[in-house]
Swiss-Prot record:
Residues 769-828, 840-906 are annotated as: Disordered. Residues 865-879 have a biased composition (Acidic residues). Signal peptide: none annotated. The HP domain is important for the localization to actin filament bundles. Belongs to the villin/gelsolin family. This is Villin-3. Its main location: cytoplasm. It comes from Arabidopsis thaliana. Binds actin and actin filament bundles in a Ca(2+)-insensitive manner, but severs actin filaments in a calcium-dependent manner, regardless of the presence or not of VLN1 (AC O81643). Acts redundantly with VLN2 (AC O81644) to generate thick actin filament bundles, to regulate directional organ growth and in sclerenchyma development.
Length: 965
C-alpha cells in the first residue's frame, strides 16, 4: 500500500462505541447511515452494510459486519459494499467477522438481529422508493421457512404457488390467513404464527382477524372456504417444484487453499491450526460455506483481494446462490470455523490480548487507517448468581459397595475426595408443589465403580420422581454456586470413607490420609457468602498459606484460625463457623499473619515463604446456545444466535454452554429413547468444546426437562413462566399463546380412541342442540363474523364434520401417545369450536328465539364441551410429566358439575396467578373452582353454573382477564 494517508470514510467515524446495530446503505458508491427508524427495511435494489456490536462479560467489544446484497442491486454497488466492509473492519481494529448476505439466503445470525423477520421491499436508490403510506393495500402471499430464524419470501398470489410442503401466509386487508401444507414442518408453522402477529401489529394496527387453514381440511372450518374463494375456488394443488434459489448447498469435507495475489492454490494434508501463518490469507471450502482466514499481520489491500478471490472461486465452481462467504481474523475465529479442525489448541483460542491489539493498531495506522475505540474494558464485579429457594429439604447419601448410605445430619457438608455422593434438595418454587435438584458429586480421587453406581442410583431416583428433578453431575473443584449454597457449611476433606476408596488405597500399598478430628489438617477458607462458602483441606505445610485467605490449622486438641493480611471480615467469620462445624465446642487460637506462635509453625513442619498473590478467577465468557445433529456419524453443533426462550423447541434437545456450566435442555415432545441420551449428548459436547474452546472436562453438566427449569438456568433468558406451562408441540403452544386458542395439529403417529359410548353421548347432545333450533328463521345475509351461510345446510355440514371427528374406527389400536393432544382430540376440538360458531350465529340471527330454547342450546353445548374437556384432560394426564406430578395434589374433578361443589375454597387474592401468597396443592388449571360462591360472583359477575356453560375458549378469556389462568 502507498505511503499516502488514507482518510477514514466520514460515515464510519466513531462507530462501534456502544452495543447495538448500525446500518449503512450504499448510495452513489458511498456508505450513507440509515436512521434507526428505518432499521429492518431492506430494498431489493440496494446493498447495505450492517455492523453488530456486542459487549462480552469481560467488557470487551466484539464486532460482526454483514454486507447485504439485494437481488436487483448492481454488481458495482455489491463490490463497493465488500470494499467498504474491509475499511470498516480496519477502523474497528481489524478484528471483526465479516459475512456476505444474499437476499433470500441470509445467515441465521443476520436474521437474528431483526426478529421475527425481514421483508425486502421493492425499489432502491436508483429506481426510487415506494413509500408504504402512498400505496393502496396489496394482498400478498409469502412462504415462511425456518424453525428459528425466519426466511420470509413473497411469491405470486396464485394457487400455483401453494404446495403441500411449505407454510404460507396470505396477507389481505381484512384478514391474515396461515395455510399449513400437509407435509409442512411443525416448527415452521409455529414461527409463521409469530410472523402473522408481527404483520398484524405493524401493518394492520393490531386489528386484523387471523385464520388458520390446514391443507386437506376443506369442510371442517368456515375460514377454509373464505381462503379458497380468494384463489378462485378450491382445486387440487400441485407438488412442490424446487427452484434454483431453493437449492441448498451440500456440506462437504473441508478443503484448505492459500490465497496469494488473488489466486487460490490447494494445500494438501490433514487440517491443522499450525498450517495457518499470520502473514497470509487462506480459503477454507466447506461446500455450503466458504471461509476466508486472514492472518493478523496481513495488509488491508491483501484482505480486500482475498474477499474478491473467494467470490471468484464460488463463481468458477458454479456454486448455488445460497453459498455463504465468511471472513474471519486470526484470534477471533468463531466456533463454526474452528469446528472444521479436529482440534484447536487453546494458545490462541481466546481473542488477542491488549499487547496484540496494540500491534494490530500500529500496523493499520502505519497503513494509513485512523483508529478509534479498539476496545473498552470495564471492571467485572462479582454478582451473586441466582440460587434455589431456601427452606427446602436436603438429603445426602454417600456411595458404598453398590448402594447408598444416608449421611447423618451432623455430617452433611463434609465431602471426602475419595468418595461419591448423591445430594437431593426438595424445595418449593412458584406455583409447583415441589421441585427437585438431584446431584452426583464425584471426588477427584473416587473410583470409576462408585461414580457409575452414583449415576445409576440417581437415574432410579429420577424415575421414581416421574422425571422431574434437575439432574447434575458435579466434579470436585468445579462446584457451582447453587450447589455450594445448599450446605450450611461445605468442607472438602482428604481421603474417603467408602470401601471402594479403602480398597484402592490397599492396592496401592497406602493407608491413605483420610481426615479425622484428631489428625493434623490445614483447611483453606476463601468464601465470602452463601454461594461460595466452600472450605478445602490442603497440604499441611506453610507454603499452602495465602495472604488473601483464612486458614484453620487443626493439631491434636488445638485449633488455630490464621488470618491473612488481605482477607476479608466475611472470610474470618466464615472460618470461625467452619471450625465450630468440624470440632464443636473447641477453643480457637487466633493467629494473624506476621504474629504466628512457634507452636503454629511447628504443626506445619516449620516456617516457610508463602504467596501473597490473589488467585485469579476463571475467564468469564458469554453463554452460547446450540442445537446438535449427527452428520455421517460425526457429532456437530450449530449455534443459535441472540437466543431467547422461544428458541427452546419442545421437540428437541438443546445445549447451553456458559463455560462455567453446560446444560442439556430436554423438550417435552422429545422421543423417550432420545431423552435417555441427554447426558451422553452433553458429554459429547464437552469433549468437542474441550478440543476447540478449551472447556474443562470436569465442567458441571446438567439435564433439565421442559417445565422444570430452575432459576440458575432461566437467568440466561428473558423467561416467561407462562410459556413453560402450555402443553403441546411447538405449533400448539404458539397458537395458545398468540391466538388464545388450541388450534392443534394432527399427529400422524397417534390417534386417540375414545369409546363408542362417549361419542354417542356427544353426538346425542349435538343432535338435541340442532333440533331445538331447527324451527328458527335466519337471515339470508352472510355473517361476516364466521363466514357461514346459515340455515339447515350450515347445520348439516357442521353435524357431518363433528360426526366425522368423533366416529373414528374403534378397532384401530393406538400406538403410544406423545405429549400434547392426540389427533382425534385435535379433530374434536376443531369440530366443537366450529359448532360453537354455528350455534352463536343461529342465536344472533333469531331475535324471537325463546329463552327456554336458548337455555336448551347452551345446556346441550356445555355437555359436548364438558365431554371434550374431560377427554383432553384424560389424554394429557396420560402423557404429560407435569400432569403425572400433579396427580398426587388435591384438585377438583374434571367434571364441571363436580368442580362447582368442591368443599375446598380459598380467597381470590391467594388464587391469582401472580399472588404474593400463592396457594399450593391445587389444580392450577382450574383456579376459579376454589372461589367461594359469593366471591366467584363478585369476580366474574355470574354464578358458577352460568360460567361453566360458556364455551371453553370464553372461560379461558375470562380467567385470563381476572388473572386466574
Amino acid at each position: 500500500m502507498s505511503g499516502s494517508t488514507k482518510v477514514l470514510d466520514p460515515a464510519f467515524q466513531g462507530v462501534g462505541q456502544k452495543p447495538g446495530t448500525e446500518i449503512w446503505r450504499i448510495e452513489n458508491f458511498e456508505p450513507v447511515p440509515v436512521p434507526k427508524s428505518e432499521h429492518g427495511k431492506f430494498y431489493m435494489g440496494d446493498t447495505y452494510i450492517v455492523l453488530q456490536t456486542t459487549q462480552n462479560k469481560g467488557g470487551a467489544y466484539l464486532f460482526d459486519i454483514h454486507f447485504w446484497i439485494g437481488k436487483d442491486t448492481s454488481q458495482d454497488e455489491a463490490g463497493t459494499a465488500a470494499v467498504k466492509t474491509v475499511e470498516l473492519d480496519a477502523a474497528l481494529g481489524g478484528r471483526a467477522v465479516q459475512y456476505r448476505e444474499i437476499q433470500g439466503h441470509e445467515s441465521d445470525k443476520f436474521l437474528s438481529y431483526f426478529k421475527p423477520c425481514i421483508i425486502p421491499l421493492e425499489g432502491g436508490v436508483a429506481s426510487g422508493f415506494k413509500k408504504p403510506e402512498e400505496e393502496e393495500f396489496e394482498t400478498r402471499l409469502y412462504t415462511c421457512k425456518g424453525k428459528r430464524a425466519v426466511h420470509l419470501k413473497q411469491v405470486p398470489f396464485a394457487r400455483s404457488s401453494l404446495n403441500h410442503d411449505d407454510v404460507f401466509i396470505l396477507d389481505t386487508k381484512e384478514k391474515i390467513y396461515q395455510f399449513n401444507g400437509a407435509n409442512s414442518n411443525i416448527q415452521e408453522r409455529a414461527k409463521a404464527l409469530v410472523v402473522i402477529q408481527y404483520l398484524k401489529d405493524k401493518f394492520h394496527e393490531g386489528t386484523s382477524d387471523v385464520a388458520i387453514v390446514d391443507d386437506g381440511k376443506l369442510d371442517t372450518e368456515s375460514d377454509s372456504g373464505e381462503f379458497w374463494v380468494l384463489f378462485g375456488g378450491f382445486a387440487p394443488i400441485a407438488r412442490k417444484v424446487a427452484s434454483e434459489d431453493e437449492i441448498i448447498p451440500e456440506t462437504t469435507p473441508p478443503k484448505l487453499y492459500s490465497i496469494a495475489d488473488g489466486q487460490v492454490e490447494s494445500i494438501d494434508g490433514d487440517l491443522s491450526k499450525s498450517m495457518l501463518e499470520n502473514n497470509k490469507c487462506y480459503l477454507l471450502d466447506c461446500g455450503s460455506e466458504i471461509f476466508i482466514w486472514v492472518g493478523r499481520v496481513t495488509q488491508v489491500e491483501e484482505r480486500k483481494t482475498a474477499i474478491q478471490a473467494a467470490e471468484d472461486f464460488v463463481a468458477s465452481e458454479n456454486r448455488p446462490k445460497a453459498t455463504r462467504i465468511t471472513r474471519v481474523i486470526q484470534g477471533y475465529e468463531p466456533h463454526s470455523f474452528k469446528s472444521n479442525f479436529d482440534s484447536w489448541p487453546s494458545g490462541s483460542a481466546t481473542p488477542a490480548n491488549e499487547e496484540g491489539r496494540g500491534k494490530v493498531a500500529a500496523l493499520l495506522k502505519q497503513q494509513g487507517v485512523g483508529l478509534k475505540g479498539l476496545s473498552k474494558s470495564t471492571p467485572v464485579n462479582e454478582d451473586i448468581p441466582p440460587l434455589l429457594e431456601g427452606g427446602g429439604k436436603l438429603e445426602v447419601w454417600y456411595i458404598d459397595a453398590n448402594s447408598k448410605t444416608v449421611l447423618s445430619k451432623d455430617h452433611v457438608g463434609k465431602l471426602y475426595s475419595g468418595d461419591c455422593y448423591l445430594v437431593l434438595y426438595t424445595y418449593h418454587s412458584g406455583e409447583r408443589k415441589e421441585d427437585y435438584f438431584l446431584c452426583c458429586w464425584f471426588g477427584k480421587n473416587s473410583n470409576q465403580e462408585d461414580q457409575e453406581t452414583a449415576v445409576r442410583l440417581a437415574s432410579t431416583m429420577t424415575n421414581s420422581l416421574k422425571g422431574r428433578p434437575v439432574q447434575a453431575r458435579i466434579f470436585e473443584g468445579k462446584e457451582p454456586p447453587q450447589f455450594v449454597a445448599l450446605f450450611q457449611h461445605m468442607v472438602v476433606l482428604k481421603g474417603g470413607l467408602s470401601s471402594g476408596y479403602k480398597n484402592s488405597m490397599t492396592e496401592k500399598g497406602s493407608s491413605g490420609e483420610t481426615y479425622t478430628p484428631e489428625s493434623i489438617a490445614l483447611i483453606q477458607v476463601s468464601g465470602t457468602g452463601v454461594h461460595n462458602n466452600k472450605a478445602l483441606q490442603v497440604e499441611a505445610v506453610a507454603t499452602s498459606l495465602n495472604s488473601y485467605d483464612c486458614f484453620l490449622l487443626q493439631s491434636g486438641t488445638s485449633m488455630f484460625l490464621w488470618v491473612g493480611n488481605h482477607s476479608t471480615h466475611e472470610q474470618q467469620e466464615l472460618a470461625a463457623k467452619v471450625a465450630e462445624f468440624l470440632k464443636p465446642g473447641t477453643t480457637i487460637k487466633h493467629a494473624k499473619e506476621g504474629t504466628e506462635s512457634s507452636s503454629f509453625w511447628f504443626a506445619l513442619g516449620g516456617k516457610q515463604n508463602f504467596t501473597s498473590k490473589k488467585v485469579s478467577s476463571e475467564t468469564v465468557r458469554d453463554p452460547h446456545l446450540f442445537s446438535f445433529s449427527f452428520n455421517r456419524g460425526k457429532f456437530q453443533v450449530e449455534e443459535i444466535h441472540n437466543f431467547d426462550q422461544d428458541d427452546l423447541l419442545t421437540e428437541e434437545m438443546h445445549l447451553l454452554d456458559t463455560h462455567a456450566e453446560v446444560f442439556v435442555w430436554v423438550g417435552q415432545c422429545v422421543d423417550p429413547k432420545e431423552k435417555q441420551t441427554a447426558f451422553e449428548i452433553g458429554q459429547r459436547y464437552i469433549n468437542l468444546a474441550g478440543s476447540l474452546e478449551g472447556l474443562s472436562p470436569k465442567v458441571p453438566l446438567y439435564k433439565i426437562t421442559e417445565g422444570n427449569e430452575p432459576c440458575f438456568f432461566t437467568t440466561y433468558f428473558s423467561w416467561d413462566s407462562t410459556k413453560a406451562t402450555v402443553q403441546g408441540n411447538s405449533y400448539q403452544k404458539k397458537a395458545a399463546l398468540l391466538l388464545g386458542t388450541h388450534h392443534v395439529v394432527e399427529d400422524q403417529s397417534s390417534s386417540g380412541n375414545q369409546g363408542p359410548r362417549q361419542r354417542a353421548a356427544a353426538l346425542a347432545a349435538l343432535t338435541s342442540a340442532f333440533n331445538s333450533s331447527s324451527g328458527r328463521t335466519s337471515s339470508p345475509s352472510r355473517d361476516r363474523s364466521n363466514g357461514s351461510q346459515g340455515g339447515p345446510r350450515q347445520r348439516a355440514e357442521a353435524l357431518a364434520a363433528l360426526t366425522s371427528a368423533f366416529n373414528s374406527s374403534p378397532s384401530s389400536k393406538s400406538p403410544p401417545r406423545r405429549s400434547g393432544l392426540t389427533s382425534q382430540a385435535s379433530q374434536r376440538a376443531a369440530a366443537v369450536a366450529a359448532l360453537s360458531q354455528v350455534l352463536t350465529a343461529e342465536k344472533k340471527k333469531s331475535p324471537d328465539t325463546s329463552p327456554s330454547a336458548e337455555a336448551k342450546d347452551e345446556k346441550a353445548f356445555s355437555e359436548v364441551e364438558a365431554t371434550e374437556e374431560a377427554t383432553e384432560a384424560k389424554e394429557e394426564e396420560e402423557v404429560s410429566p407435569a400432569a403425572e406430578a400433579s396427580a398426587e395434589e388435591a384438585k377438583p374433578k374434571q367434571d364441571d358439575s363436580e368442580v362447582e361443589t368442591t368443599g375446598v375454597t380459598f380467597t381470590y387474592e391467594r388464587l391469582q396467578a401472580k399472588s404474593e401468597k400463592p396457594v399450593t396443592g391445587i389444580d392450577f388449571k382450574r383456579r376459579e373452582a376454589y372461589l367461594s360462591e359469593v366471591e366467584f360472583k363478585t369476580v366474574f359477575g355470574m354464578e358458577k353454573e352460568s360460567f361453566y356453560k360458556l364455551p371453553g375458549w370464553k372461560q379461558d378469556l375470562l380467567k385470563k382477564k381476572f388473572n386466574l389462568f
